[in-house]
């Protein structure tokens, strides 16, 4: 045992269970919403590459999908368009949905007082 052995990674590829359950969640979510589009978010220093599904009303969900290839395959499997956020940006309806939810939460808090 070397001095730095405890810092080396052991084992094979990362477990697929998380990616599979994320893909299943995205497929279920897309099936239960109308007008769904996928937006690929780039990897950052904090997060892995993710895909955001946005419905016609702006409701959205985000999950990891196993890289850009996985995101594109998900789009093909679900028969939905796939966009790159770095090129297109987020859709306005997504921002509008977040703003509506923020206002609703604020009103709810005020009613509770």
Q: What role is predicted for each listed range?
A:
Residues 1-113:
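Intrinsic disorder
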């Amino acid at each position: 045992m070397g001095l730095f052995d405890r810092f080396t990674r052991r084992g094979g590829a990362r477990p697929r269970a998380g990616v599979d359950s994320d893909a299943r969640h995205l497929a279920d979510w897309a099936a239960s919403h109308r007008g769904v589009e996928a937006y690929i978010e780039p990897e950052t220093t904090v997060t892995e590459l993710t895909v955001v599904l946005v419905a016609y009303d702006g409701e959205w969900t985000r999950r990891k999908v196993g890289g850009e290839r996985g995101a594109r395959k998900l789009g093909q499997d679900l028969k939905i368009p796939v966009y790159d956020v770095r090129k297109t940006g987020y859709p306005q309806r997504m921002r509008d949905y977040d703003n509506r939810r923020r206002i609703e939460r604020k009103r709810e808090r005020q009613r509770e007082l």
